[in-house]
Regions:
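A short gly/proline-enriched turn/hairpin at secondary-structure junctions
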Residues: 34-43
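A beta-strand edge to alpha-helix "cap/lid" segment located at domain peripheries
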Residues: 2-5, 36, 51-111
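Generic alpha-helical hydrophobic packing signal
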Residues: 9-16, 43, 78-81
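Short beta-edge strand/loop motif at the mouth of beta-sheet-based domains
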Residues: 42-52
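Short hydrophobic/aromatic-rich motifs at helix boundaries and adjacent loops
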Residues: 21-27, 38, 64-67
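Short, low-complexity N-terminal intrinsically disordered segments enriched in polar/charged residues
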Residues: 1-27, 31
Length: 111
């Protein structure tokens, strides 16, 4: 997976959030993926748990806005963005790690 593909995944992720489309987000993740959002909290293991997590975020009205360029290294991409929800904004850096099939195997959010 080259850097352009990783950056395209970031853009697709942000677009899926804007559309409120959990199925697009689901299609980006590996079956055995892990989401830790934020880092240090209980992780979400597997597609069902990950989709439930995203349904909660989308149900709360969360929207994403990139706040800087994505940075790629190895099998990962890190990107800064703002999460905007009614009454609050959070500055976040997400790190996606990809498996050999180009699916997200790990997502860690720092905020």
């Amino acid at each position: 997976m080259d850097n352009a593909d990783k950056i395209a995944m970031v853009e697709r992720y942000v677009e899926a959030f804007e559309k409120g489309d959990v199925e697009i987000i689901r299609s980006m993740y590996a079956q055995d993926a892990v989401v830790e959002d934020p880092v240090g909290t209980d992780a979400h293991h597997g597609l069902d748990a990950i989709c439930a997590f995203y349904q909660g975020a989308l149900g709360a009205g969360a929207k994403l806005r990139l706040s800087g360029p994505a940075r790629c290294a190895g099998n990962a991409v890190a990107f800064p963005f703002h999460v905007v929800m009614p009454g609050m904004q959070i500055d976040v850096i997400d790190v996606f790690e990809f498996n050999d099939e180009g699916k997200i195997s790990s997502m860690k959010a720092y905020w």
